[in-house]
């Protein structure tokens, strides 16, 4: 039978071990969307190394109706510091420049924002002695519905 407590403790220990091997003393950088995947990943990180070593990054694309959920998760659920970096203007500027050069496909419109979030996470990570945390779930990994080096870090 599946033992949730053991699986949770195994994940927490894995995070501690991975951090020790890949960046002793580093911070863990988590993209916080307000969804379950980023919440669980961030909570495991907090349990593993403490809230003071976990930094949330909230990255709306222009306006986001449910952005308060992400803020509440950081402030009241996790107790972590967070940054808000709106990727909307970068998204708009890149799309405008692409439109000048070629016809932008719907796939490009869909996938650009997650890729901008990925680059943002790595920029934050590099500036905060951090490592980017994978917030994908197994089903997303299995079907390939993730952003390489982004939520699939």
Segments (PLM) and residue ranges:
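Gly/Ser/Thr-rich active-site loops/lids in small-molecule metabolic enzymes
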Residues: 150-153
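ATP-dependent adenylation/nucleotidyltransferase module used to activate substrates
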Residues: 1-147
């Amino acid at each position: 039978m599946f033992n949730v407590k053991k699986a949770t403790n195994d994940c927490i220990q894995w995070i501690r071990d991975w951090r020790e091997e890949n960046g002793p003393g580093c911070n863990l950088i988590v993209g916080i969307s307000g969804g379950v995947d980023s919440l669980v990943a961030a909570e495991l990180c907090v349990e593993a190394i403490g809230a003071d070593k976990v930094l949330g990054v909230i990255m709306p694309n222009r306006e986001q109706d449910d952005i308060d959920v992400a803020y509440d998760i950081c402030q009241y659920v996790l107790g972590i510091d967070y940054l808000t970096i709106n990727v909307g203007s970068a998204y708009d500027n890149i799309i405008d420049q692409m439109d000048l050069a070629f016809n932008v496909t719907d796939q490009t419109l869909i996938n650009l924002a997650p890729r901008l979030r990925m680059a943002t996470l790595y920029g934050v990570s590099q500036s905060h002695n951090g490592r980017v945390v994978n917030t994908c779930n197994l089903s997303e990994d299995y079907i390939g519905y993730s952003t390489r080096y982004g939520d699939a870090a």
